[in-house]
Structure formats: structure tokens, C-alpha cells
């Protein structure tokens, strides 16, 4: 796998999130960011785990489902994780990402679960869509010219959020299904990948993307799929990392659109 690039969900810690539903506490660094892939000098990433697909034609939509994982909060140290589908953000020089998903964060020993969307580089929006561990979540991001439609549904409760938005320069160069270690950014734009929540395993299903005239799953031979592994101890990445754990995706299932990402504790240093 080639080196991977970086943007993300940016949550301002100093402002109350719009229409927040049990919003997860935010880090004191100033911004909690999700989005483009942080690249490293290895085959892995310091912030993304999952799959991305690319094609010479622009993508029009991406869809996926996952079961909201339960956060294990072992002590008072804050940890963060995000699960989402999106368009853009994968290319090395990506300038934007359109994404929606859920968070599983720990703060003060307690777990918090939140739904959100983001059209990076605009800040993210927290949603009044209650999410609990074990809930099945369905997400779709679709783009036509400068119109972005976000659709996020808690399939378990039947609650649905949908919104049509304007975005001047959407990135349609890739489609992704990702578990992420968010980044904390100060107000000068310096960012660090934050400690990754122990989420156990998150199962993605119904993963599809569309380009003009074609809809397919991750393993569709029409496009090129890349497996992305998150390694919290990589050297030579584009930004510092405090992820402190790995997140490793399994193989895509026989249906072509399902896979699992598993949190892994870092092995102790040797020597």
C-alpha cells in the first residue's frame, strides 16, 4: 500500500456544537479534526483504518452501515474515535472531504457517543441524533456539482437526519469507509493525532460507491481499492501522533462490501 494523505472532522472545543445530542467532550487543544488521511513513510496511516477506492471518474456517492461500537474507558485519560463514510480526502494533495458518521469518545472515565457530519475545511456539526452502542447506523454522502446531501440514520431507532448543503469545492476523487483516530489542532493549525479509543471491533457492511452510470462495492474491479491500516507508533508521518494503538481492517467479505476494523494495543517496545 502506498503512503496515505490527511484532513478531518474539525470540532471547535470553545464553541457549543450546533444541535448537540450528548455531544462528546472535546480536547483542549482547540480543534478535534477528522478528514483527509495523514500519510506516513510506511504502507500504513497514523489516523485512518479501513478502505478507500479511487477511479479516474469522479465519485457521486458513498454509502455504508456499521454497528456502533462500545468504548472501553479504562481511566480518566481522554480518548477519541470516529466511524464514517465519505468522499475525498484520500489523495496526497486532497483539499476537502465530505463525511458523516459517529464518535465513541472517553472523557473522565465515561463514554460518549455522538453523530456528526463535516464538509471540511468547514467545521463539523454535531447532530441531534442519539446513538448508543449496538445501534446500527446507515450513512450516505452524495454530491452533484456543488450540492452535498448528507443522510445519517439510526436504523435501530428509526431516527433519520438528512440535509442538503452547498460546498464550493467538493473533493470527488475517492470514496472511503473508515475508523479514525481524530486529530487535535491548536488555533495556529498545528495538529496531533489524538489517543485512539479502545472500541473493540467495528463492523462495516453495505459498503457501496457510485460513479456516473455505475454502482459497486469495495471489491468492484471497476475501481482500485486500498486497504488502510492505522499504526499508532509510525515514524516519519506528516504530523505527530499520540494514537497509542493500532486499528487493523480485516479482508473484505465475500459480498464485496463488508469488513471489520479491530482496535489493537501497541506491542511494548523491545530492546
Where do the model's predicted regions map?
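Secretory targeting and sorting signals
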Residues: 2-23
Amino acid at each position: 500500500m502506498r503512503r496515505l494523505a490527511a484532513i478531518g472532522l474539525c470540532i471547535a472545543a470553545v464553541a457549543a456544537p450546533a444541535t448537540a445530542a450528548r455531544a462528546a467532550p472535546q480536547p483542549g487543544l482547540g480543534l478535534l479534526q477528522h478528514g483527509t488521511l495523514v500519510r506516513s513513510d510506511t504502507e500504513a496511516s497514523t489516523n485512518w483504518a479501513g478502505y478507500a477506492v479511487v477511479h479516474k471518474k469522479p465519485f457521486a456517492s458513498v454509502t455504508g452501515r456499521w454497528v456502533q461500537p462500545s468504548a472501553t474507558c479504562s481511566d480518566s485519560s481522554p480518548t477519541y474515535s470516529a466511524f464514517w463514510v465519505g468522499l475525498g480526502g484520500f489523495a496526497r494533495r486532497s483539499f476537502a472531504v465530505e463525511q458523516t458518521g459517529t464518535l465513541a469518545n472517553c472523557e473522565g472515565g465515561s463514554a460518549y457517543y455522538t453523530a456528526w457530519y463535516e464538509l471540511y475545511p468547514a467545521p463539523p456539526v454535531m447532530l441531534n441524533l442519539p446513538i448508543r452502542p449496538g445501534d446500527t447506523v446507515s450513512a450516505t454522502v452524495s454530491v452533484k456539482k456543488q450540492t452535498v446531501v448528507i443522510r445519517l440514520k439510526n436504523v435501530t431507532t428509526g431516527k433519520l437526519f438528512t440535509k442538503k448543503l452547498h460546498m464550493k469545492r467538493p473533493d470527488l476523487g475517492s470514496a472511503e469507509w473508515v475508523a479514525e483516530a481524530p486529530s487535535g489542532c491548536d488555533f495556529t493549525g498545528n495538529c496531533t493525532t489524538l489517543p485512539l479509543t479502545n472500541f473493540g471491533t467495528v463492523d462495516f457492511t453495505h459498503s457501496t460507491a457510485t460513479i456516473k452510470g455505475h454502482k459497486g462495492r469495495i471489491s468492484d474491479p471497476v475501481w482500485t481499492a486500498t486497504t488502510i491500516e492505522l499504526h499508532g507508533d509510525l515514524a516519519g508521518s506528516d504530523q505527530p501522533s499520540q494514537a497509542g494503538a493500532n486499528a487493523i481492517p480485516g479482508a473484505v467479505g465475500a459480498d464485496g462490501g463488508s469488513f471489520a476494523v479491530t482496535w489493537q494495543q501497541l506491542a511494548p517496545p523491545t530492546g
